[in-house]
């Protein structure tokens, strides 16, 4: 029998997928922590707080939690992390990009991502949807989309590729021109009053 010499890194966990139609915000914020921190570094109190304050919206029919997570809730949680995470033994900083400056080509965003930070980005995908930005190059953005899809879902879209072999990093490769297209196409950045990009970095 051949000896298995592969060494695995068990200190972090793979990024995760949402388990309902509504928890993309919850899952993406937790994925930011999964990406940045070792499992042993993530405070259970922070985890519980995120679960408690996301999924705060009702839908147009008044059904509680079925409106997903509001921008207000995400910004509230990020402010709370800035104030309290250190006391919970997690050194993390969250920064919201001003709405007028929201773009995949924002220099502050690019610099932070290149230095190991991540960002929660609100995108269009049939409806408003949160994904985690983890990497950028000249032409493409690399994101983890918490909504699980078949590998061939975007075969007819030249701007989007589904990636299946980077579970700790990303699962979508998206052309930056698509993200800044100000359209209703998948992965176009939301630019209305609910637009949001929140940069999250480990200090």
Where are these regions (language model features)?
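Active-site-adjacent structural segments surrounding the nucleophilic cysteine of cysteine proteases
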Residues: 1-69
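Generic short alpha-helical segment signal, independent of protein family or function
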Residues: 37, 79-86, 191-199
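General structural signal for secondary-structure boundaries
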Residues: 41-48, 66-73, 100, 104-105, ...
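Papain-like cysteine protease catalytic cores
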Residues: 50-99, 104
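Alpha-helix N-cap/loop-to-helix boundary motif
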Residues: 62-69, 101, 125, 191-194, ...
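Active-site-adjacent substructure of cysteine-protease-like catalytic cores
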Residues: 93-148, 152
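Noncatalytic regulatory segments and standalone regulatory/sensor domains
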Residues: 113-114, 136-203
